[in-house]
Curated annotation (Swiss-Prot):
<keyword id="KW-0813">Transport</keyword>
<keyword id="KW-0225">Disease variant</keyword>
<dbReference type="GO" id="GO:0070160">
    <property type="term" value="C:tight junction"/>
</dbReference>
<keyword id="KW-0472">Membrane</keyword>
<feature type="transmembrane region" description="Helical">
    <location>
        <begin position="4"/>
        <end position="24"/>
    </location>
</feature>
<dbReference type="GO" id="GO:0030003">
    <property type="term" value="P:intracellular monoatomic cation homeostasis"/>
</dbReference>
<keyword id="KW-1003">Cell membrane</keyword>
<dbReference type="InterPro" id="IPR003927">
    <property type="entry name" value="Claudin16"/>
</dbReference>
<dbReference type="GO" id="GO:0160184">
    <property type="term" value="P:paracellular transport"/>
</dbReference>
<dbReference type="GO" id="GO:0030001">
    <property type="term" value="P:metal ion transport"/>
</dbReference>
<dbReference type="GO" id="GO:0030165">
    <property type="term" value="F:PDZ domain binding"/>
</dbReference>
<keyword id="KW-0982">Primary hypomagnesemia</keyword>
<keyword id="KW-0406">Ion transport</keyword>
<keyword id="KW-0796">Tight junction</keyword>
<dbReference type="GO" id="GO:0015095">
    <property type="term" value="F:magnesium ion transmembrane transporter activity"/>
</dbReference>
<comment type="similarity">
    <text>Belongs to the claudin family.</text>
</comment>
<dbReference type="GO" id="GO:0005923">
    <property type="term" value="C:bicellular tight junction"/>
</dbReference>
């Protein structure tokens, strides 16, 4: 059961870290809505904006100004949150790899490997927090901006909605939460053994064999009184 839970958590951690990294460095956080009067598809990301012509499929991208330039608060905060989530998710996944039983790292220390899995789970839980905050906040801001324009009957010729990069960030964050929950909440399921499992199997087997041989070789000495009593009982 322990191995199965570890592999499930590793599966979610791998794809979650990948989703977060792809979401951070792709350009479709905002995409023009279907009701926009545009002949091209516009996508806005955290680092650049791309336009794809609907007729010939030509795609052109323009990078934003320098990082030190003034940017909207939504863009700056989302960048910081997603980069933090990427680093933590990657670190959590690599840490989890060291804690897997199939990895030849500290093979004689199962208790330490369980602790490594616990640290990886806690890191993944922490990684999901900035990821989900950044993704949801960006999506809500896009929705509120669009709803405000519609409410005040303001039409700028193009309306935006959040795109697949935003969805990918949410999925990666939820995956981090799930992997972290499996590793932390199920930690006691990993401890399905007693204290003797802190020693390698070969040593436990050697100790057991030595104990059996010592028990067989040892016989309590018989006193003279016991011998006399045995003779009397036979008579």
């Amino acid at each position: 059961m322990r191995d199965l839970l570890q592999y499930i958590a590793c599966f979610f951690a791998f794809f979650s870290a990948g989703f977060l990294i792809v979401a951070t460095w792709t350009d479709c956080w905002m995409v023009n809505a279907d009701d926009s009067l545009e002949v091209s598809t516009k996508c806005r990301g955290l680092w650049w904006e791309c336009v794809t012509n609907a007729f010939d499929g030509i795609r052109t991208c323009d990078e934003y100004d320098s990082i030190l330039a003034e940017h909207p608060l939504k863009l700056v905060v989302t960048r910081a949150l997603m980069i933090t989530a990427d680093i933590l998710a990657g670190f959590g996944f690599l840490t989890l790899l060291l804690g897997l039983d199939c990895v030849k790292f500290l093979p004689d220390e199962p208790y330490i490997k369980v602790r490594i899995c616990f640290v990886a789970g806690a890191t993944l839980l922490i990684a999901g927090t900035p990821g989900i905050i950044g993704s949801v906040w960006y999506a809500v801001d896009v929705y509120v901006e669009r709803s405000t324009l519609v409410l005040h009957n303001i039409f700028l010729g193009i309306q935006y909605k959040f795109g697949w990069s935003c969805w990918l960030g949410m999925a990666g964050s939820l995956g981090c939460f799930l992997a972290g929950a499996v590793l932390t909440c199920c930690l006691y399921l990993f401890k399905d053994v007693g204290p003797e499992r802190n020693y390698p199997y070969s040593l436990r087997k050697a100790y057991s064999a030595a104990g059996v041989s010592m028990a067989k070789s040892y016989s309590a000495p018989r006193t003279e009184t016991a011998k006399m009593y045995a003779v009397d009982t036979r008579v």
